[in-house]
């Protein structure tokens, strides 16, 4: 089973590289397709619904799949805020008042809370968001012979550097559904690689190991 929480518990880093995949604002897979490829070694794909595939090139296509039962989402939206820190302050105040806030970034920093039976006072300066959905964005593995529906999280890895739509990034990735009904590309970086690569670049490779570890946590 693919479990992102387990990766975090192991001390690995999960970095969101690109959000809103499959949506109209998707700038990475604007043609609704992600291509993962390597120059030498094979790629391996594992989907949460049991689909497994191994090749030097993997195509994932986003499709809007009709729902048998449409659903409606309601939430109260605060913002937009100029920065994450401003949104965080608002979220803290809402939590102190007994609400369950979520800090998000669909286009700007916002704070969302669920709609309850009694709406908060308008003095809190929020907007009511309500939207009905009759389809969902679903990833499909496609090749020249067939296509297979995938379920997230999806894990894609290789011993080689992986090229995604022409851009070389790393060699371990996840695709996971987000709070907006779209998908996020997440890079997995193991703690040892982070200490050897990113952190020495930030504070100097000659720094003591303990200092590097502290910087990684920060």
Residue positions per predicted region:
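Conserved, single-site charged/polar hotspot
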Residues: 1-218
